[in-house]
Regions:
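Short S/T/G/P-rich N-terminal loop/turn motif that feeds into the first structured element of a domain
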Residues: 2-67, 76-84, 100-118
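Short arginine-rich
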Residues: 92-95, 99-101
Length: 118
């Protein structure tokens, strides 16, 4: 399932401010998911407190357990603030220890934003 999102609530093609995107790709370990769900909810609430956070969306394939989360921020400073929050650092360590078989992170600058809407 793909989610459709627009930066800052604006439609594509309008004067959208500079954005940066963090792409988090991961493969979940096999587990009951309870602790993961708890931490996922905590992190979802926490990221929304970052000045410069815009929005995010994600999806995960139930069979392969591969997932992608795409998060939008207005600045590299906001991304750094998010990365270095103590509670987020605890979640990162839990991810390495308990939640993920592997993951990768890419930080990208949005150069163009356009699309089609019927």
């Amino acid at each position: 399932m793909w989610a459709k999102t627009w930066a800052c609530g604006q439609k594509r093609g309008q004067n959208v401010p500079m954005s940066y995107v963090v792409i988090f790709r991961s493969t979940r370990k096999l587990d009951d998911g309870q602790l993961y769900s708890e931490w996922s909810e905590k992190m979802e609430a926490l990221v929304k407190t970052i000045d410069g956070y815009e929005h995010h969306f994600g999806f995960r394939d139930a069979i392969s357990r591969d997932g992608v989360t795409v998060s939008y921020f207005t600045s590299l400073e906001a991304i750094s603030q998010w990365k270095n929050l103590n509670e987020h650092k605890m979640a990162q360590q839990l991810g390495r220890d308990s939640f993920y078989e592997e993951y990768s992170v890419q930080v990208c600058e949005v150069l163009r934003d356009y699309g089609f809407e019927a």
